[in-house]
Amino acid sequence: MSTNGESPAPEGAGDSRDPSGFLSEIIGAPVTVKLNSGIVYKGDLQSVDGYMNIALERCKEVAEGRVIRNWGDAFVRGNNVTYISADNA
């Protein structure tokens, strides 16, 4: 039981940081973006807004660990995004 009046995070819940705070911390960092269609993009996160619209630089489309296509700069509409993951640099 939490002593500060807050409910403890469920076991296995992971990091409980605010997603918008996390995203602002990783601007300029390498990320992986997975779309609802299953397509995966890797690139440097340049911006993200409240609708999860994402701008990437040095964007590459990746499948099965291989680069399929280099896109350069790319914009991804937020309603297509399944997740954004920070990559280890």
Curated annotation (Swiss-Prot):
A cellular component annotation (GO) from this entry: U6 snRNP
Location of the region described as Disordered in the Swiss-Prot/TrEMBL record: 1-21
Keywords (A to Z) from UniProt: Cytoplasm, mRNA processing, mRNA splicing, Nucleus, Ribonucleoprotein, RNA-binding, rRNA processing, Spliceosome, tRNA processing
Gene Ontology biological process terms in this record: maturation of SSU-rRNA; mRNA splicing, via spliceosome; tRNA processing
UniProt key word Repeat: no
Subcellular compartments: Cytoplasm; Nucleus
Subunit structure, as described in the record: Component of the heptameric LSM1-LSM7 complex, which consists of LSM1, LSM2, LSM3, LSM4, LSM5, LSM6 and LSM7. Component of the heptameric LSM2-LSM8 complex, which consists of LSM2, LSM3, LSM4, LSM5, LSM6, LSM7 and LSM8. The LSm subunits form a seven-membered ring structure with a doughnut shape.
Record's function text: Component of LSm protein complexes, which are involved in RNA processing and may function in a chaperone-like manner, facilitating the efficient association of RNA processing factors with their substrates. Component of the cytoplasmic LSM1-LSM7 complex, which is thought to be involved in mRNA degradation by activating the decapping step in the 5'-to-3' mRNA decay pathway. Component of the nuclear LSM2-LSM8 complex, which is involved in splicing of nuclear mRNAs.
Family the UniProt entry places it in: Belongs to the snRNP Sm proteins family. SmF/LSm6 subfamily.
Protein name as it appears in the record: U6 snRNA-associated Sm-like protein LSm6
